[in-house]
From Swiss-Prot:
GO molecular function: toxin activity
Keywords assigned: Disulfide bond, Secreted, Signal, Toxin
Leader sequence residues: 1-21
GO cellular component: extracellular region
Name of this chain's protein: Short neurotoxin homolog NTL1
Disulfide feature: 24-45, 38-62, 66-78, 79-84
Length: 86
């Protein structure tokens, strides 16, 4: 009976997927950098950087897809590891 109960507990934990949530750096030029927990469907961390008024602007966060559009000098970087968008 204990074996059956233990098996059910292990199966429940495995089915709930209690483990992994991706973390990405967020916001812009904060020091120290802050992170956010991404929602379950967010697979990518991104970093957008561009020059506006002679000042570099940076935006970071979680994303469902990896945008690959580069326009007007804007650089977009995507990655899939935790905190890889430094």
């Amino acid at each position: 009976m204990k074996t059956l109960l233990l098996s059910l507990v292990v199966l429940t934990i495995a089915c709930l997927d209690l483990g992994y949530t991706k973390t990405c750096f967020n916001d812009d030029l904060t020091n120290p950098k802050t992170t956010e927990l991404c929602r379950h469907s967010m697979y990518f961390c991104f970093k957008n950087s561009w020059i506006a008024g002679g000042v570099e602007r940076i935006e970071r966060g979680c994303s469902l897809t990896c945008p690959d559009i580069k326009y007007n000098g804007k650089y977009i970087y995507c990655c899939t590891r935790d905190n890889c968008n430094a």
